[in-house]
């Protein structure tokens, strides 16, 4: 008796949570289409595991998203992970173009990707897992653009859950708190690595692998189980303004 190999598409797969998720899925026997803008990094990722196939993707470009759908005519799982935060400006000082970029990548990019892959997901009675954030439920000063985008992701998850329930497609969200990834905070601070490192100072933060483990767990529940939301945080983070920072152990 043979078992058909399942296919997963992971966006934002060139680094961080996306790359870790692609690895975890491939380790469990999935055929993984790892999609992102940086093909050099995807090539290195696919070299690690024969089950990972790179695919160039810019989620802000409809033609690029259509090409992704052509590259994955069969799809059992979409991990819509592409997104970003590009500023920490207050609402009074915010640059509208920066907010538009955040929304285009994080929200509209997710919409484009889901739309393109939905026929394949419906055919397989598959699953959509959105990478959310505690920023989709918590708010903080200077985070308005990113917070609004991640609140929108939470709303998309709720909407898709209602709209796809009759099709058999499952819809889930994995929403991490503080995750120490090499690039996320550095991009947000305009490349100032010292400021980026200070975000996680004294905190045993989540890793990309921690979040990937949660995504893979959600994606491997029995078909009759829909995990609506998994929110995970470091033990030291009980809220956006409740983070216990401890000095490093000698």
Language-model regions: role of each:
Residues 14-15:
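Conserved glycine-rich cofactor-binding loop
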Residues 56-67, 96:
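The beta1-alpha1 cofactor-binding region of Rossmann-like NAD(H)/NADP(H)-dependent oxidoreductases
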Residues 119, 162-163:
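Alpha-helical segment proximal to the catalytic Tyr-Lys
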Residues 133:
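Residue(s) in the substrate-gating loop at a strand-loop-helix junction
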Residues 173-174, 193-241, 245:
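C-terminal helical subdomain
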């Amino acid at each position: 008796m043979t078992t058909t190999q399942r296919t997963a598409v992971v966006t934002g797969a060139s680094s961080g949570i996306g790359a870790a998720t692609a690895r975890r899925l491939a380790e469990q026997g999935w055929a993984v289409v790892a999609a992102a803008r940086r093909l050099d990094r995807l090539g290195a990722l696919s070299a690690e595991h024969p089950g990972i196939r790179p695919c160039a993707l810019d989620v802000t470009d409809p033609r690029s998203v259509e090409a992704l759908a052509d590259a994955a005519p069969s799809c059992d799982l979409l991990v819509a992970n592409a997104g970003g935060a590009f500023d920490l400006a207050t609402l009074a000082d915010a640059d509208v173009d920066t907010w538009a970029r955040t929304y285009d990548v994080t929200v509209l990019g997710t919409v484009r990707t889901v739309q393109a892959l939905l026929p394949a997901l419906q055919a397989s009675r598959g699953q959509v897992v959105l990478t959310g954030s505690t920023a989709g439920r918590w708010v903080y000063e200077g985070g308005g653009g990113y917070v609004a985008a991640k609140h929108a992701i939470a709303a998309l998850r709720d909407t898709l859950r209602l709209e796809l329930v009759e099709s058999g497609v499952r819809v889930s969200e994995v929403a991490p708190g503080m995750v120490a990834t090499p690039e996320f905070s550095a991009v947000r601070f305009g490349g100032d690595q010292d400021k980026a490192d200070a975000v996680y100072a004294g905190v045993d933060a989540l890793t990309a692998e921690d979040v990937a483990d949660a995504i893979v767990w959600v994606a491997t529940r029995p078909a009759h189980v829909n995990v609506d939301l998994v929110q995970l945080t470091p033990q030291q983070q009980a809220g956006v303004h409740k983070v216990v920072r401890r000095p490093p152990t000698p």
